[in-house]
């Protein structure tokens, strides 16, 4: 994206500040993180900072006045350090390159920032920001209060910037959606590669095993060779019973013929995440029990997809998926009709949570669990259930609109238990796709990898 995109975003934020009474917004990029000794983790910018600037160097701050003026503080050019760490944009090039009105050496931050905040009604910053950011801002306010006898006023209010940024980021423009489609395409290709890899291994060595980390390596290779900068989150590659663990991380167990493999993985491309989950048979053929549960989950995702459209509530997809899953639990014998009742009773009692205990949908964007309010805060409270399924009173979930992006990810996770048919024990299944809300419904942008059981089996042959 060229600088005009970021200039437009900063102008929108400035309008939001004016509408809320004025002030100055302060956003710092992410700090560098030490791994050990003199080695740092690979650097990743703060998502909102990059959303407003397109600038991905560390040690940078952005201040935006309600009148629209943007000031960037960044590292200066340093030929000696650039030998070791690479080229820097530098202060002199920043205004023309990034479209900001002013640029300063970040070493001057504590002198420049108070001047930009002086006599402004409010300072806006993300209240969940790094503690160092809050401390820095409080120090600037103290500096300004010390100049009160000179007629200088410190901002009287501190306001949370995070909700304004979240609302902006929730609605994607055409450029953002194009990047997310490409990220989903790369990730879908990686999932397909992993399926083909397992199919080939078990064709040549039916009695052998594939380690989870071998499959993960196939994913990472495909991400990087197509230009993705990194995984969007640590990949979950779960063999057999490990698929019952929602955030499984070990990635060192063997996958054997007859077991399922659950992969939850997506790449990050140019600052945007993808998030795909597929569950497939290690040797390329579902057992009858595996396929029975798989078809239930796939039907639940179809119901969630049909419920994802403009004017629908964000939570509608979850309710639709739960109804299909609950009916499937009764039909398959996971739940006992005599004990648990019909589908409405199963939902009312939350008995389904024995096998499906997480939500179906979350926002997707620059972060894999992206920012954005899930509730419609302007509406009156309504009766609902909390995260554990207990009755609660809450705001209704917000209404979906074109340009929003969500995941749709129902699943079933079966642990050995009395009354649960043994043929289903230790099966874990999740199917997840990325959905762009359109004018008429939603577009699944991650279907470059098969999802139907027969298509998965065909790919692995």
Set out the residue ranges of the language-model regions:
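Active-site neighborhoods and metal-handling regions in enzymes and metal-associated proteins
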Residues: 1-461
